[in-house]
Amino acid sequence: MNYILETLNLSKKSGNTYRVKELSMQVPVGSVYGFLGPNGAGKSTTLKMILGLIHPDSGEIKVFNQKLNSSNKLSILGQTGSLIENPGGYGHLTGLENMQIIQKLKGVNEDEIERSLKTVRLFEQRDKKLKNYSLGMKQRLGIARALLGCPKLLILDEPTNGLDPAGIHEIRELISSLPKERGITVIISSHLLSEVEQMADYVGIINKGKMLYQGTLAELETKGEGLEDAFLKLTGGKESL
């Protein structure tokens, strides 16, 4: 199997406490990979290490079959889109103007703006000021910005946080469509099992910085377990279901 992302024994400490400990993950090309765990399990820390926002204490990261290092980080991350934490943006500017800022920073063709806005179904609202967008629309605009430059890999950290059911549905439909329509592999971190179950092909379950399970949803079913049962058994507690 071909993997677009692999980590090997990735670790990060905060003081004497491991935030991530010897974590190894493999994300297949063309998949939606659900990265699951309770709040504080180490999901965001792992994704920030993959994106070069913080440095691991030990272990290695391979993206596009290349070991991530200081000499190739910019070229590799240039093919990676991400939305970590809040989507941000300038409320007094339109959706289009917010996109143009990122387009110029990335140095990509302006045609990419239209394509990305159409992918997230915001093209018709491009001239509306960002402050008048719903939270779901702001999340979709954040994903549109991440899609500029045609990334091979898209990393989304809790993209449905704070959304109402309609907004969650919009994001779920969008994420599910990206591998087929754009050829993009998606990693989505979440603690909402029911949402990930409707989007993901593969899942990794993490708790206290350690990877506890990694594989397909189908493999869990062959063991007589659903995602919820496996999650509760592995993490030892009830989460958002």
Q: Regions from the language model: what does each represent?
A:
Residues 51:
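Helix-to-loop junction immediately C-terminal to a conserved catalytic motif
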Residues 100, 104, 110-126:
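Conserved ABC ATPase "signature" region
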Residues 169-182:
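Helical segment within the ABC ATPase nucleotide-binding domain
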Residues 154-158:
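Catalytic Walker B motif of ABC-type/P-loop ATPase nucleotide-binding domains
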